[in-house]
């Protein structure tokens, strides 16, 4: 298993600088953020402009990675592919296709996204809509030698307060979509499952046939706040770097391996204690790498 990180934690820095940080901190892989340059929401970045990438640009990026001994585990564009507004949905789906095209140029086999949610429809209707939308998107990706994967953040409050903005955030929803779109992969993130009360270790073991990528992000329950703040509200938990929260990482990694996954563990840095100035962000990534690296098997 190799360690990487999602580059969305460094939105203001160019890819060349991100690569330098990765090699200095001991990472081997990068999950490269590919949101549009005009993106406005948090936890996003545009380290590859997929709208303008051509073969020459792809060759330059491949060379940068190779010179530093790194590889790209996936391209990342996590947005609402089921947006209720047809124009917004067309833009999101179109950018996802461009991200797939970029992956093909770069020789990258995975592109990550969210399913999203159309809040004008029922959950059952959304599953059927997702099957249609992702049936077309996975076919587009497959024709280009790329596999789409979905991540399981519920995105509560993304479109409406107290409401999940991402349809497929737990095993029950995964089952419904994978039954309809079997070529879709899963980028499993245990941090969301933990605060939702879903067993992340069982999910890692039981969904090995679908897991193609894994995020490393921890969760800390703020118990004094939770004594006053109900489950449906926020502020009673927060994301942390691996090892600074409550997840049992040896157990999670073992469950992944037992389920048949042994590829990339990609740190998603959303730790508020280690955000802000570049040296704080870098420090968080270094802490995560130092904690996770001893837990992984490194063949001689």
Show which residues each predicted segment covers:
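Histidine-acidic metal/acid-base catalytic patches
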Residues: 1-29, 107, 135, 160, ...
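Short, flexible/disordered intra-domain loops and linkers
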Residues: 40-52, 158-167, 277-283
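Active-site acidic/histidine proton-transfer and metal-coordination neighborhood
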Residues: 17, 59-68, 80-185, 195, ...
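Short beta-strand segments at enzyme active-site cores
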Residues: 30-33, 72-76, 109-115, 147-152, ...
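Glycine-rich, proline-tolerant flexible connector loops at the mouths of alpha/beta enzymes
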Residues: 33-60, 121
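Active-site-proximal loop/turn and secondary-structure-junction residues that shape catalytic pockets
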Residues: 9-11, 34-36, 79-81, 115-119, ...
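N-terminal small/glycine-rich loop or linker at the start of catalytic domains
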Residues: 1-4, 72-83, 231-233
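Glycine-/proline-rich flexible loop or hinge segments
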Residues: 41-48, 76-84
